[in-house]
Amino acid sequence: MSAAVPTTRAGTPPTLQCGWRSACGKLLDIANYVIFSPEASAVVMPVLVAWECVLLKLIVKHVPYTEIDYLAYMEQIWQINNGERDYSKIEGGTGPLVYPAGHVLIHRLLERATDGLQNVARGQDIFTWLYLLTLVLQFGVYRMLRLPPWCIVLACLSKRLHSVYVLRLFNDGWTTLMMVVAVFLLLLAARHPRLCLPAALVYSAAVSIKMNALLYLPGVLVALFLLTRGHLLALALCGAVAVAWQVLVAADFLSTHPAEYFATAFDFRRQFMYRWSVNWQLVGEQVFSHPTFHRCLLLSHIAILMLFFFTRYAAPRQPNWFRTAAAALRHPATAVLAASPPRAHVAYVLLVSNFIGVLFARSLHYQFLAWYHWTLPALLHWARMPCLLALLWYVLHELCWDTYPPSSVASATLYALNSALLLLLYINGPPA
């Protein structure tokens, strides 16, 4: 008689049961690797780029384009092409030209590419490539920061962001591209300090497109100081390069109407429309428009920046800013810091500075999500939230931006979410 195969109580042979357990264990290991291991990003990122290529084509094909600001951009460019150089007289259907000359340079090229409004489909193609190029460069930043794949996936999940790029053709995407390139170069400069100069140039290009890039300015100054190891002459050279670009790109306007250019292109007193404010529907329109409210936001912005500056931004090995500054002033042609900071520290300084500015911005319109959405994967990772809690945070954040028209509940929720994230970023400090 043949021996009977031993079975478990459930009637399953032990060898088969062990096989199932082994297979399940391997699947769990693979899932854990793909979700949490930074090394898996080399596999996840190409898949996400391919997915975005398909998704963007489907969006453009099946969702109608909505005209909001692109016509106004073209009307302003037509006036410039006709010889107008007084910025205070250049207007479009939605108001005056309030963007610096880098915006004009880009949209002159776009006006040719799209033949004004005759070929908006080509413009959508250009903005599709703009989105994808920005995404690939973002992924380069994430790779250097060793973000886990679950964070990286968040960069591709915003319905609002896809709309801003390929269905609205807002200019915010161009500023974001320049800022991502600038951050990318500054992270590389942690090992190759000579890249500080091109980083300063690209940052200046971002500012010349739209002023929101100035939210990064405190972080950029700190990062350049740390990356040049406190070498003040090197820092001054970076500043000179940045200023030179501003003069060069605006030369046509500065040579004829300089006062009008600065007053209009860099108008810090500009009034925003309350009805489109995503972040301040929780206050009344009278409060929103009152100068005292604006001053309170500015003072709060400065106070929080100072808190981070003195307690979180200093060089890891030399935390006393006063001693560092004194040494730099005594020896402006000498590097006074022992070493360049780690890449993660540079990124923390840059991205948190921008996020603080977003939190205290006088208004956030729907397209302004592009200012900081790309930084959320890194910020959520540094906040050290559990994965599921971070995903919940992201979903709620996206719902706030997808609420139309803006509501007081969505505004209050958005402010609470962003405040909680900033608090966690402060508590946990720069990543090691």
From Swiss-Prot:
Residues 1-124, 190-206, 252-290, 365-375, 430-432 are lumenal. Residues 146-168, 228-230, 312-343, 397-408 are cytoplasmic. Its EC number is 2.4.1.258. The keyword Ion transport does not apply. It is a multi-pass membrane protein. It is an enzyme of class 2 (transferase). GO terms for molecular function: dol-P-Man:Man(5)GlcNAc(2)-PP-Dol alpha-1,3-mannosyltransferase activity. It is found in: Endoplasmic reticulum membrane. The chain crosses the membrane at residues 125-145, 169-189, 207-227, 231-251, 291-311, 344-364, 376-396, 409-429. The keyword Nucleotide-binding does not apply. Keywords: Endoplasmic reticulum, Glycosyltransferase, Membrane, Transferase, Transmembrane, Transmembrane helix. It catalyses: an alpha-D-Man-(1->2)-alpha-D-Man-(1->2)-alpha-D-Man-(1->3)-[alpha-D-Man-(1->6)]-beta-D-Man-(1->4)-beta-D-GlcNAc-(1->4)-alpha-D-GlcNAc-diphospho-di-trans,poly-cis-dolichol + a di-trans,poly-cis-dolichyl beta-D-mannosyl phosphate = an alpha-D-Man-(1->2)-alpha-D-Man-(1->2)-alpha-D-Man-(1->3)-[alpha-D-Man-(1->3)-alpha-D-Man-(1->6)]-beta-D-Man-(1->4)-beta-D-GlcNAc-(1->4)-alpha-D-GlcNAc-diphospho-di-trans,poly-cis-dolichol + a di-trans,poly-cis-dolichyl phosphate + H(+). Its main location: endoplasmic reticulum. Dol-P-Man:Man(5)GlcNAc(2)-PP-Dol alpha-1,3-mannosyltransferase that operates in the biosynthetic pathway of dolichol-linked oligosaccharides, the glycan precursors employed in protein asparagine (N)-glycosylation. The assembly of dolichol-linked oligosaccharides begins on the cytosolic side of the endoplasmic reticulum membrane and finishes in its lumen. The sequential addition of sugars to dolichol pyrophosphate produces dolichol-linked oligosaccharides containing fourteen sugars, including two GlcNAcs, nine mannoses and three glucoses. Belongs to the glycosyltransferase ALG3 family. PANTHER family: DOL-P-MAN:MAN(5)GLCNAC(2)-PP-DOL ALPHA-1,3-MANNOSYLTRANSFERASE, NOT56 - RELATED. This is Dol-P-Man:Man(5)GlcNAc(2)-PP-Dol alpha-1,3-mannosyltransferase. It comes from Eremothecium gossypii (strain ATCC 10895 / CBS 109.51 / FGSC 9923 / NRRL Y-1056).
